[in-house]
């Protein structure tokens, strides 16, 4: 389970004595990127990736995130559910040292027939989210693997 309610739902089922079966799947942070022609890792660009939630249960950006560590320690960031806080997230990453020219992909409605992928950069991502009217759920991908989108998918929507 990645940043969802799966664990809490399983706990409720166990507490209620309900038998259930977990069916494994592929998280949007992998499947959505693949569908957009963006590898999560590539031997030529990164040996690490960090998955981050864009908001907590209360709806705020997680206070415990170490933006300096994230900015310097992970070449590729995959941010789930961050559209509402994209202004703050992009600002914090740039303040922590990521350049405004850093490649960014915004993937709306990942792995559905309505998936829409827009590539941009960290400095312009908020404007592009509004310009292309991208709606949640949305993934925000920051890093060099974003450059593969046009090459592997053959399009930018």
Question: Where do the language-model regions lie?
Answer:
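Short glycine-cluster motifs
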Residues: 1-56
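A contiguous loop/helix-start segment that scaffolds small-molecule binding in enzyme catalytic cores
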Residues: 5-12, 46-48, 52-157
